[in-house]
């Protein structure tokens, strides 16, 4: 099984990236959030990988963060949620936010995500509440202070520039660790560089 890929980004598409590892291009399905956090083609990158083996195919699903991979693995354990559906869900909501919504039983928040109806949201809460509690605790209460403000401003700026919500959320999440103490214009320049890559 393939658990990690490190190489150069050869291509970025709507729902996948091609990672060139030693001259071999691996097609890796990724969420919009992970896709937005990947560097431009030609740049080095590493992805955590889930290998899905079917009778007629072998599919790779990639994740920019450990949290996203953990939530993906939990989602595919839920009856009726396969790898593609899990990836689509994670394109609409950040992994820790999903974990918090599940832990709080927030069905209304979950149903705002494309691909999650009321019955699926209720099933997620019932089946995943215990599995995602540690991740929800790690997410803690809402992000504090200036970091939250500048990331919210960054998302708003990207949306105003015409980027889709998953793209804005993905790049903001990718910049979270380096956001503290940085001005919005600097973060926006870095976000645009990543998105245009």
From Swiss-Prot:
Major subcellular location class: cytoplasm
Region entry Flexible linker, spans: 141-145
One annotated GO molecular function: ATP binding
Region described as Domain II: 65-141
Keyword DNA repair assigned: yes
Chain positions covered by the region annotation Domain III: 146-197
Alphabetized Pfam families for the sequence: HHH_5, RuvA_C, RuvA_N
Subcellular location: Cytoplasm
Xref: SMART domains: HhH1
GO biological process: DNA recombination; DNA repair
Residues covered by region (Domain I): 1-64
GO cellular component: cytoplasm; Holliday junction helicase complex; Holliday junction resolvase complex
NCBIfam families registered for this protein in UniProt: ruvA
Biological function: The RuvA-RuvB-RuvC complex processes Holliday junction (HJ) DNA during genetic recombination and DNA repair, while the RuvA-RuvB complex plays an important role in the rescue of blocked DNA replication forks via replication fork reversal (RFR). RuvA specifically binds to HJ cruciform DNA, conferring on it an open structure. The RuvB hexamer acts as an ATP-dependent pump, pulling dsDNA into and through the RuvAB complex. HJ branch migration allows RuvC to scan DNA until it finds its consensus sequence, where it cleaves and resolves the cruciform DNA.
Name of protein: Holliday junction branch migration complex subunit RuvA
Species whose genome carries this gene: Anaeromyxobacter dehalogenans (strain 2CP-C)
């Amino acid at each position: 099984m393939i658990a990690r890929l490190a190489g150069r980004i050869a291509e970025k598409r709507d729902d996948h990236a091609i990672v060139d590892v030693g001259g071999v291009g691996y097609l890796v399905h990724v969420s919009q959030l992970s896709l937005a956090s990947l560097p431009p083609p030609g740049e080095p990158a590493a992805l955590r990988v889930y290998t899905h083996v079917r009778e007629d195919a072998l599919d790779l699903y990639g994740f920019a963060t450990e949290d996203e991979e953990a939530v993906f693995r939990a989602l595919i354990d839920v009856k009726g949620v396969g790898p593609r559906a899990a990836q689509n869900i994670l394109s609409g909501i950040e992994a820790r936010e999903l974990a918090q919504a599940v832990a709080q039983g927030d069905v209304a928040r979950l149903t705002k995500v494309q691909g999650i109806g009321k019955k699926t949201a209720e099933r997620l809460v019932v089946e995943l509440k215990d599995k995602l509690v540690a991740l929800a605790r790690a997410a803690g209460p809402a992000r504090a202070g200036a970091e939250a403000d500048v990331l919210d401003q960054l998302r708003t700026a990207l949306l105003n520039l015409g980027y889709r919500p998953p793209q804005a959320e993905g790049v903001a999440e990718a910049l979270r660790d380096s956001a503290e103490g940085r001005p919005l214009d600097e973060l926006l320049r870095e976000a645009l560089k990543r998105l245009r890559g």
